[in-house]
């Protein structure tokens, strides 16, 4: 009560922030007449003036009024568009490391030009982050004329671009790209083998469009760069044949209950578990198929990989549905983003799940992958010095933005008051009744010329509604992951009178639905349109626009509630832009996923008590409240999952930063010999300690073991036993010094052969390769640790603390292994004079030619002649990277002398 009273008197935090910023808006508005008087050249010259002021030590925030006034004036001259006062407010919010909640149609793209220009003045680079390539390209091309008018450069960062083009894009003042591409470039830069291969600069300022989609919906998705692991595709096929024999366990109170099934499904946690009966059956089937031996248990340690295959296959069949979770296109399983409904080309599920789905669908099974580098979006975006974002719906997630990213949310008021009518939900008993009611609503709306946008949560549902509309003879457009090529064009015309558009989730975000359709799209479709044609198109559009407003504006129909209120609000937000008329309504049934999992028992009981007849809908505050509670439950659960993921990833993140920092330092120096010398001392001390314990009696020394270890691991053949026999005065300390001195002497002789410069280059290469190899293995080990750590809870131990403790021990062990591997590799490398290598290669070539001639003489048929010709050709060439090294070491050329090339 007291808080409410204080808020009424002093205003909320949001009100106070906006009040403070409105004073700056008044200053910007006062500067407008002065800016209008400037010539184009004088306006352009302001950029150089601002940069000079920053160099002299002026604070960036002091430039806000004048810089924003310059951008507003430039926009008027270049685009003929003037930033509204609310857009200036939005620009200031974005500069203050906050999330700006701006409703759909309020001009977020134009708002972003203000903080982007201001922060680009520092010369450190601005990254504008969008959800897909189309929006990145569109926004970059749309805003390029404005930024170039003001003397700034603009780059676009797209997947598949060559490294020089990416480097150029990142070197620009303002770079547009997708969240995935920025993250992958960061990982690739930290796998580079020379400073020239890196493309990104230091991460300075990120301006994230649709920030809720990227920082919340995708927060659980780690970005992973992977390499191929061993092939086990045959096992996926064999296990896949067994799964259809298993029966799902139904709830005892359900109509389909037939006694105990073989596996149970937990839809909340997306897990599948075998029952006792299921375990017996699956073991029988595995024995029958010859996959497992008679009398063996599926849970025995020897069958742990088989258990992994069975679990993956069960999940693929029970939890993942075609045209909902994925689509099959051109013989490939492509994941569908659960939040946007878009396909995610190139993304794959982990833990063998993707291979299990491929086996289920009968398409080619691709190899499992091993992680080489990974990072979550949560940790990638926290690397920026300054982070801000904008979206139409952030307020429901304000707590998460604040607790995880330290970003406050500021709700920016609309330019014109919102007049959209949000009608109460209608709940039906069955899905068929709900679909029928939706069709009737669409018929009524289109009859009076009102456009309708139907939002579905999956491709399957969008096609179901589409089929029903086709049966009813209603023309419509379908917008889902299968047909997203024309996405922007379809969305742009979704406001046409009586147009019906079915969109999966939030497909088409970022494109405004203009009432009456888009006249710009009509003009763009014409070749060299005349002024008269353009005027006629505009006049026709105005008539259509007025007709749609008269009919009630755009009507939104939600075919079911999403598990997040925010995504429902995004769908509603497509209507009522810029103060336009509009309406929205959600249609639900007791068969919807959200209702079935989270709200079914209570609500269906309520509906039965009310004595509902088939086809009747319930519209009651209790039901709406029950649904809102169900959504809150899911949101809270998802937040906990994301928070927990972050807590675990933070452990890996500290290690990642340490490794990447060390790696970058290594890349930037040309001489690592001092580091190598220091490491050598540590490694030899630890190795000798294992056989000659410090300050121990000679009887405790294991000299034969030490000699063997030095020979095997460091290629040092030292007569230590002989030394000790001949020199009784040789004590522990001098022996240690002599072994180390011998290893240094042998190494220096190698250096004299190849030269210091070549040796420094080789040392750096070995350190980088060894670091990458061990980091890759460490990531896999961390992954295994993470998967089983929750079991420590049964031993009354905190899994998070145990994970921190064990991962730290593993990391320390990895760093010790790094030192050992580097010194071992450098010690064992064989070097020869270039003349010796050439002589050996000449001998090899002559031998190959001799064999080829013998082959030609002994076989005269075409095939063997072709083979001999090929052998002769092979003999002519230089040593291949994977051929045995001519020095006779038995190693591959690339791992021996090829390393010194």
Swiss-Prot record:
It is a peripheral membrane protein. Its main location: membrane. Zn(2+) binds at residues 885, 887, 896-897. GO terms for molecular function: ATP binding; metal ion binding; protein-exporting ATPase activity. GO terms for cellular component: cell envelope Sec protein transport complex; cytosol; plasma membrane. It comes from the Bacteria. Induction: Repressed under conditions of excess protein secretion capacity and derepressed when protein secretion becomes limiting. This is regulated by SecM. It is found in: Cell inner membrane; Cytoplasm. ATP binds at residues 87, 105-109, 512. It catalyses: ATP + H2O + cellular proteinSide 1 = ADP + phosphate + cellular proteinSide 2. Its cofactor is Zn(2+). One of its GO terms (biological process) is intracellular protein transmembrane transport. Keywords: ATP-binding, Cell inner membrane, Cell membrane, Cytoplasm, Membrane, Metal-binding, Nucleotide-binding, Protein transport, Translocase, Translocation, Transport, Zinc. Part of the Sec protein translocase complex. Interacts with the SecYEG preprotein conducting channel. Has a central role in coupling the hydrolysis of ATP to the transfer of proteins into and across the cell membrane, serving both as a receptor for the preprotein-SecB complex and as an ATP-driven molecular motor driving the stepwise translocation of polypeptide chains across the membrane. This is Protein translocase subunit SecA. It comes from Shigella flexneri.
């Amino acid at each position: 009560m007291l808080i409410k009273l204080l808020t009424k008197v002093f205003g909320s935090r949001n009100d106070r922030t906006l009040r403070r910023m409105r004073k700056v808006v008044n200053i910007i508005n006062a500067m407008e007449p002065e800016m209008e008087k400037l010539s184009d050249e004088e306006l352009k010259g302001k950029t150089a003036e601002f940069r000079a002021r920053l160099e002299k030590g002026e604070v960036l925030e002091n430039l806000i009024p004048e810089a924003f006034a310059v951008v507003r004036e430039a926009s008027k001259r270049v685009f003929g568009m003037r930033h509204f006062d609310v857009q200036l407010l939005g620009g200031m919010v974005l500069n203050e490391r906050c999330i700006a909640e701006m409703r759909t149609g309020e001009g977020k793209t134009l708002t972003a030009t203000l903080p982007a220009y201001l922060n680009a003045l520092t010369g450190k680079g601005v990254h504008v982050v969008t959800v897909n390539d189309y929006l990145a390209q569109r926004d970059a091309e749309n805003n390029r004329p404005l930024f170039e008018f003001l003397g700034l450069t603009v780059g676009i960062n797209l997947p598949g671009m060559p490294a020089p083009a990416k480097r150029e894009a990142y070197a620009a003042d303002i770079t547009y790209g997708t969240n995935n591409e920025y993250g992958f470039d960061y990982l690739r830069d930290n796998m580079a083998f020379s400073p020239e291969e890196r493309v990104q600069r230091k991460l300075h300022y990120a301006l994230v469009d649709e920030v809720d989609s990227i920082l919340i919906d995708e927060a659980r998705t780690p970005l992973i760069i992977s390499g191929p692991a061993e092939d086990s595709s045959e096992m996926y096929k064999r296990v896949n044949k067994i799964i259809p024999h298993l029966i799902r366990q139904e709830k005892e109170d359900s109509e389909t209950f037939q006694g105990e099934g073989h596996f149970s499904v937990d839809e909340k946690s997306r897990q599948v578990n075998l029952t006792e009966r299921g375990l017996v059956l699956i073991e029988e089937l595995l024995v029958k198929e010859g996959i497992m031996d008679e009398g063996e248990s599926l849970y025995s340690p020897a069958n742990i990989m088989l258990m992994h295959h069975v679990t993956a296959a069960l999940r693929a069949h029970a939890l993942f549905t075609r045209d909902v979770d994925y689509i099959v296109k051109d013989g490939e399983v492509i994941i569908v983003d659960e939040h946007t409904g878009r396909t995610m080309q190139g993304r794959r599920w982990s833990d063998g799940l993707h291979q299990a789905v491929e086996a289920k669908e009968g398409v080619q099974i691709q190899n499992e992958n091993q992680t080489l580098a990974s990072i979550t979006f949560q940790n990638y975006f926290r690397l920026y010095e300054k982070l801000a974002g904008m979206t139409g719906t952030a307020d429901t997630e304000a707590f998460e933005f604040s607790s995880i990213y330290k970003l406050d949310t500021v709700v920016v008021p609309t330019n014109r008051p919102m007049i959209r009518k949000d009608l109460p939900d209608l709940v039906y008993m069955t899905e068929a009744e709900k679909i029928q009611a939706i069709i009737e609503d669409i018929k009524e709306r289109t009859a009076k010329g009102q456009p309708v946008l139907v939002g579905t949560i999956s491709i399957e549902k969008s096609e179901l509604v589409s089929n029903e509309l086709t049966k009813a003879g209603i023309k419509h457009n379908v917008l889902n992951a299968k047909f997203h090529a024309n996405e922007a064009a379809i969305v742009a015309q979704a406001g046409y009178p009586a147009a019906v558009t079915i969109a999966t989730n939030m497909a088409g975000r970022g494109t405004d639905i203009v009432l009456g359709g888009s006249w710009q799209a009509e003009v763009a479709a014409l070749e060299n349109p005349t002024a008269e044609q353009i005027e006629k198109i505009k006049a026709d559009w105005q008539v259509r626009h007025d007709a749609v407003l008269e009919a009630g504006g755009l009507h939104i129909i939600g075919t079911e509630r999403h598990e997040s209120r925010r995504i429902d609000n995004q769908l509603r937000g497509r209507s009522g832009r810029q103060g336009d008329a509009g309406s929205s309504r959600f249609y639900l049934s007791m068969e919807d996923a959200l209702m079935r999992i989270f709200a079914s028992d209570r609500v269906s009981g309520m509906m039965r008590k009310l004595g509902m007849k088939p086809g009747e809908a319930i519209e009651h505050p209790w039901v709406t409240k029950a649904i809102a509670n169900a959504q809150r439950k899911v949101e809270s659960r998802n937040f906990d999952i994301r928070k927990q993921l972050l807590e675990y990833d933070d452990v890996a993140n500290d290690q990642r930063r340490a490794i990447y920092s060390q790696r970058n330092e290594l890349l930037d120096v040309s001489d690592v010999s001092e580091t190598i010398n220091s490491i050598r001392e540590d490694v030899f001390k630890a190795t000798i300690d294992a056989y000659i314990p410090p300050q121990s009696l000679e009887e405790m020394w294991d000299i034969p073991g030490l000699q063997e270890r030095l020979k095997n691991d460091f290629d040092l053949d030292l007569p230590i036993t002989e030394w000790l026999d001949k020199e009784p005065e040789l004590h522990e300390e001098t022996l240690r010094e002599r072994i180390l001195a011998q290893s240094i002497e042998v190494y220096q002789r190698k250096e004299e052969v190849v030269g210091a410069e070549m040796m420094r280059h080789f040392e750096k290469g070995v350190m980088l390769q060894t670091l990458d190899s061990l980091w890759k293995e460490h990531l896999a080990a961390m992954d295994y640790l993470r998967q089983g750590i929750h079991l420590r809870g049964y031993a009354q131990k905190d899994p998070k603390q145990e994970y921190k403790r064990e991962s730290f021990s593993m990391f320390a062990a990895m760093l010790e292994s790094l030192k050992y591997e580097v010194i071992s590799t450098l010690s064992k490398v064989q070097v020869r004079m270039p003349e010796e290598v050439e002589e050996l290669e000449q001998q090899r070539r002559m031998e190959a030619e001799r064999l080829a001639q013998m082959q030609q003489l002994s076989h005269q048929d075409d095939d063997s002649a072709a083979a001999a010709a090929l052998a002769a050709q092979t003999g002519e060439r230089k040593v291949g990277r994977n051929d045995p090294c001519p020095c006779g070491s038995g190693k591959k050329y690339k791992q021996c002398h090829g390393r010194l090339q």
